[in-house]
Amino acid sequence: MRFPSPLIEGRLVRRYKRFLADVALADGTLVTAHCANPGAMLGLNAEGFRVLLSPSTNPARKLGFSWELVEAELPGGPQWVGINTARPNALVAEAFRENKLAPLAGYETLRAEVAYGKASRVDFLASGGGLPPCHVEVKNCHLMRQAGLAEFPDCKAARSARHMEELAGVVAAGGRAMLIVVIQMRADAFDVARDIDPAFDRALRAALAAGVEAYAYTCAVGPEGVEIAEPVQILTSPASPAGSGTS
């Protein structure tokens, strides 16, 4: 996914009210950008970090910029990280069209926002090609507290835990369901940040034990664009059967 116009560089002054960020541009102008990220953004929102903003083409929009990337000082060294949580679904759709997602090989269509479960909408429903329909939930990941290890979530994620339960319900009913974690940075492996949200950890492990598939992909991130790069290992283990005495 290439950005449609060149990004604007600045330095982060502060991120506040979850969805707002003040940025000092190179010429000294202070602008307020939309921050499309409801999470804690641990390690990504320090004052002075270099950031890149996409300019809005809508003259009626209140905020003229959206925060896209941050050059964060992460364990293992600095790197560009995508912080816009609206991007991962588009990245998955693009990778599907380009046949870059092996777990979805053979499917012909990928429909977005399909109703299922308890008044929920799954991110995608893959169908066609003589294959059973597959419910696909996408999660954005940009937390790194150990070199090479990407983690999710970076705050309590009750809605995401519910999504895992509903995917497990799809499998229990005889269907196919999967989680795709889009890591908007370089990483070597993925795991759940269970110390941040043990409830999501339990929900994912139960879903894996029920037969839900899970895949994690890193991204190539830079000023020109973001694209899904390669799969990495998921370290989270399925929940053990009840009464097994293991965790």
Curated annotation (Swiss-Prot):
NCBIfam families linked: sfsA
InterPro entries referenced in this protein's UniProt entry, alphabetically: SfsA (IPR005224), SfsA_C (IPR040452), SfsA_N (IPR041465)
Name used for this protein in its record: Sugar fermentation stimulation protein homolog
Signal peptide: none
Molecular function (Gene Ontology), one example: DNA binding
CDD domains: SfsA-like_bacterial
Gene for this chain: sfsA
Family: Belongs to the SfsA family.
